[in-house]
Amino acid sequence: MQDEMLGIILAGGQGTRLGKLTKDTAKPAVPFGGRYRIIDFTLSNCANSGVNTVGVITQYQPLELNAHIGSGASWGFDSLNGGVTVLQPYSSSEGEKFFQGTAHAIYQNIEYIDQQDPKYLLVLSGDHIYKMDYDAMLKYHQEKKASLTVGVIHVTNEEAKRFGMMNTDATDRIIEFEEKPEHPKSDKASMGIYIFNWPTLRDYLVKSYATDKSLEDFGKNVIPSYLANNESVYAYAFKGYWRDVGTIKSLWQANMEFLSPHNRLNIGDRYWRIYSKAEVLPPMFLTETSQVNNAMVVDSCYVAGEIDHSILSQRVSVGMGSRVVDSMIMPGATIGKNVVIDHALIGEDAVIGDDAQIIGTTDKIAVVGYHETMGVEQP
């Protein structure tokens, strides 16, 4: 049944709220949890759900993301029965170039989707941390005879201001949609996960864009139009672990949760693996001066200091006398001697000089950017 469904991952966003961490790379390529990048979770969900063909729509700073995805072999997408295709903006005969929003990105890739000839289109965001069976959502979509099914989670009133919110009837049919309301009428928030009947969506996009060049987003344009036209739109409630890591604080929190043995993400589940691009690296090395407490230290790390409740990604070096607490250090970062890092996110390949102090709080996480150098005298 899954072969009738094509997966499209929207991975072109700039991620401006992550500041320096996405200055030179796309948000889905940001490292997470020591061994992964954010997009690994969505790609792995597709692989585990039996979604064999996936298109990844990229745009902003795509080079690192494209290299990470490669042929898709790390997720099993290099077989004869499927594959992964990176879809980038291009100039058409109509002069179209960059994607203006989620719906516009799908419209611009109609030709690719038509080549796959799916009955259902699964549209996903490439910047969330979660594990989800999309096949179960497809079965729900079919049982409801829906035209569109939206994945939803329950959120607080305060959180609702950041999401598209939905009101439903007793059968979970969506009767009203509000984009980031000040006073939400329900607690059901869109996860940015959609299953469309492709012929219906295709017809809508072609007709709408022919008359309205401002067509941009699913939340702003498509869902309200579906509801206005009395299409059958249903909410699919997801009850597992799901995190939107679009802000510095939420990215830090999700990494700290990752350290907990009671984390609902259950990364050790052998029946639902999270895959990533494999690198052949030497083992980590802990010197006699090192101390590691409730931390994750992965391949090719060198540690001569103290690591407490933190994540050290691949190829991180921590000098003697340094202390890293409640922090996530991204791949390739170099930390000198007698450094204090507390409540911080340290970007990929950053360099922290001797005696530096990078100290944040739970409410204001300290950040060192991608390839940024701090506390080192420049020649």
From Swiss-Prot:
Superkingdom field: Bacteria
Pathway the protein takes part in: Glycan biosynthesis; glycogen biosynthesis
Keywords assigned by UniProt, alphabetized: ATP-binding, Carbohydrate metabolism, Glycogen biosynthesis, Glycogen metabolism, Nucleotide-binding, Nucleotidyltransferase, Transferase
Entry-linked PROSITE patterns: ADP_GLC_PYROPHOSPH_1, ADP_GLC_PYROPHOSPH_3
EC number of the protein: 2.7.7.27
UniProt-listed HAMAP family: GlgC
Subunit composition and interactions: Homotetramer.
Residues that, per the record, bind alpha-D-glucose 1-phosphate: 164, 179-180, 190
Any one GO BP annotation for this protein: glycogen biosynthetic process
InterPro entries (UniProt xref): ADP-Glc_PPase, ADP_Glu_pyroP_CS, GlgC_bac, GlmU/GlgC-like_hexapep, NTP_transferase_dom, Nucleotide-diphossugar_trans, Trimer_LpxA-like_sf
Reaction(s) catalysed by this chain's protein: alpha-D-glucose 1-phosphate + ATP + H(+) = ADP-alpha-D-glucose + diphosphate
Gene3D superfamilies named among the record's database cross-references: Hexapeptide repeat proteins, Spore Coat Polysaccharide Biosynthesis Protein SpsA, Chain A
Disulphide linkage map: none
Protein name in the entry: Glucose-1-phosphate adenylyltransferase
One GO MF term: glucose-1-phosphate adenylyltransferase activity
